[in-house]
Amino acid sequence: MENLIPVVNKLQDVFATLGRKEDQIQLPQIVVVGSQSAGKSSVLENLVGRDFLPRGTGIVTRRPLILQLNHVALDDESKRRRSNGTLLTDDWAMFEHTGSKVFTDFDAVRKEIEDETDRVTGVNKGISLLPISLKIYSHRVVSLSLVDLPGITKIPVGDQPVNIEEQIREMILLYISNPSSIILAVTPANQDFATSEPIKLAREVDAGGQRTLAVLTKLDLMDQGTDAMDVLMGKVIPVKLGIIGVVNRSQQNILDNKLIVDAVKDEQSFMQKKYPTLASRNGTPYLAKRLNMLLMHHIRNCLPALKARVSIMNAQCQSDLVAFGEPVEDKNRTLLQIITRFATAYTSTIEGTARNIETTELCGGARICYIFHDTFGRSLESVNPLENLTQLDILTAIRNATGPRPALFVPEVSFELLVKRQIQRLEEPSLRCVELVHEEMQRMVQHCGFTTQQEMIRFPRLYDKINEVVSGVLKERLKPTNELVENLVAIELAYINTKHPEFTEANLVTLLKEELLLDDRHGRSRNRHASTGERAVSAHGEQQLQPVPGVNGVDLNAVLQQQQQQSQNQRASNGFLGLFGNAAASSKTSPQEKQSANFLPEVPETQLGRKLTSREQRDVAIIERLIRNYFIIVRKNIQDSVPKAIMALLVNFVRDNLQSELVRQLYKPDEMDDLLAETEDMAQRRRDTLETMKALQQASVIISEVRETQVW
């Protein structure tokens, strides 16, 4: 299992070359978290056995420091010999950003960390998420992989932003949220452990404490008469992986250049004297061994998931590269292939034979079918055959068709006049159907499959041109399609076929029978009234020969004659003139009326409101029924013929001629360079994906080198 940590270190090197957070795999590592001046740097230096970290007041660590500790035995010449043949006899360090440069002076390591930090964050106290990667090779260290983060602070200093506390907190959470990480929460012993900020942050992402280890620093600086026994034993706040106490070098020790080896010896003496029962489970040596063991077991547990993650990312990169396509070499062949693929995908979308069927919405041919049989059908059904046609309109049309002669039957001309006006109303929804199909065929350009969409992104200028060609072809076909649809309505208007089988047999015969039946009933009624009137007049005639005594000297015969005269005048007023009102009913004519020609009133343009006679009601009912039934026949014809016209002149024509039109307009040698020019973003994405894929392949090789016997 000792080989597991070097494996992770190699993986960190591989993925560090990518430099992009989204491409990183969450590797097992130890994340060091603590407040400012909590002693984090001292703990790390004690683990390494060297002074190499920047020191000072305020925030010293301003970028994440990925620290890889590699144990190299003094007699391991294979690892200590450099490529130039020199043999390294002591500890050395290497930075990722300096390449193969070797640092044997650890003061120079400190200076390089400071310079690299200032290069990115500035000379004041700004922070950055961009990590610094440092490898240290020594016979004194155990193999570890750690991340040192900026200390938690409350008040901004220098050119730090006012939200510096929030920025540092977000950075810490970003690293400790990695489920493959171990959290090393550093807290000074001379502060209340119950209010430890690192422990609080760790609880947010690791509530069960499965991957949190606490370190209690500055045990030698506690107040006289107090100790950290209860804290170290977990009685104050229990920490599942344990709480380990350490003693750091004081600032005076550092100024006096006290060696870390001597400081570790003094730490052991302090532990034996102050905490004899806990000495074996505290101190820097125990912390290093404990971290090494925890990290190895953690890597062992994470390795299967790590293998799976690398495989998944590798497959995704391969898929992305296929989508991005190979760099264009033969532009003639590439252009023809793209045109052919697009035309095939467009045709498949119309016919419903595409491999990737849309499941969230109707598109292509299915949407055209929906327009024909649902949208267009409902639109025609919503047209009322008698809408905007009143009884007065019908009656006026009947009378205008008869001219000066009263009609015995309903004139056919009035029916044709009225039904044509209603048929004309079918033209608007028919043209709207053409428009909807045209819009859908334009929209289908965006629904031609994943491959086509990727090529749209890769060659935006080419697909702008393809869109223009498709729009042009559709626009060309729109005019003849509209003309044919208008002609279909005009054909129905040109000839009203009253001999249509559905119209003649079902309607005219029935209406004729009803009209004859009504005439027969009215005739018998008139005969009965006439016979009764004759008998009354005969009896009255015999009686009027005799003088009739009056009342108060009034002759009743004279009164009857006067009433008869008034009755005749009233009947005259209900004749032809009565149709225009009762202006002629009065027996006296005013001087103004005598000034008009023939002493007749002005004829109004429309009839005044009155109750229709039974004959008029019958005529109106006949016309309404004829219009309704014939309109339904025409509506069926239009509902059937308009979709056929659209399919013939628009849909099928575009489907059959699109590819040849694309080749004719786009296959031009002088324009190929412009059409097949990739966006810079697409080229960069291909390069990034190739780099990621190369790193993943290296990672896969590294992981495959770990034998199962080593892991378990």
Curated annotation (Swiss-Prot):
Region (G2 motif): 60-62
Region feature (G5 motif): 247-250
Classification via Pfam families: Dynamin_M, Dynamin_N, GED
One MF term in the entry's GO annotations: microtubule binding
Catalysed transformations (reactions): GTP + H2O = GDP + phosphate + H(+)
Location, primary (coarse class): mitochondrion
Keyword Transmembrane in record: no
Chain segments carrying region G3 motif: 148-151
Record's protein name: Dynamin-1-like protein drp-1
